[in-house]
């Protein structure tokens, strides 16, 4: 996942 990608954390903004």
Swiss-Prot record:
Keywords: Mitochondrion, Ribonucleoprotein, Ribosomal protein. GO terms for cellular component: mitochondrion; ribonucleoprotein complex; ribosome. Transmembrane segments: none annotated. Coiled coil: none annotated. Disulfide bonds: none annotated. Its main location: mitochondrion. It is found in: Mitochondrion. Putative component of the large subunit of mitochondrial ribosome. This is Putative large ribosomal subunit protein YmL1. It comes from Saccharomyces cerevisiae (Baker's yeast).
């Amino acid at each position: 996942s990608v954390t903004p």
